[in-house]
Amino acid sequence: AFSGKSVTDEILDRKILKGTLSSNVDDICKTVYVNLPVSESIEGFKQKRYWPITEKALREGVVNALVHRDYAISGASVRIFLFTDRLEIRSPGRPPNSVTVEKMKIGIRVHRNPLLVDVMEKLHYVQKAGLGIPMIFSEMRSLNVEPEIRIEEEETILSIPLARKNG
């Protein structure tokens, strides 16, 4: 997690995970959630919390990055950057074959690592339906923010703006 909007800002929290795929998904999601800015308000007699990213969108983004990354790129790793205005999930490699950003948004699927997808399906992390990216966009649109997918050099980046309490 960074103190501002750039990687040149102060690092507030940094973790390097070397566990199993499933434990890394869980640990990444927990670490991000601990560092997210949470808004609170009183509604009636109850306190209500507003999270800037839904749990489903976060988990799906992390799972996609780990399962669909290009493991042939030596020395590269999935990187998660939490800034004050957005979360960036950076996955090594460009999309495989003829997959484009637009095709990802509508759920076209090509599994770069089918064995990993099978394992994660058996562990109930994925459904193999190609609906992860459309679900992330739907979840975040429900909070009135628009995620972005972009390709930079040899990385696929999912950028999710942090929602504010009133959109």
Task: Explain the meaning of each model-derived region.
Residues 1-26, 53-166:
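Conserved beta-strand-loop-beta-strand hairpin that lines the nucleotide-binding pocket
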Residues 4, 17-50:
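Helix-hairpin-helix/helix-loop-helix acidic hairpins
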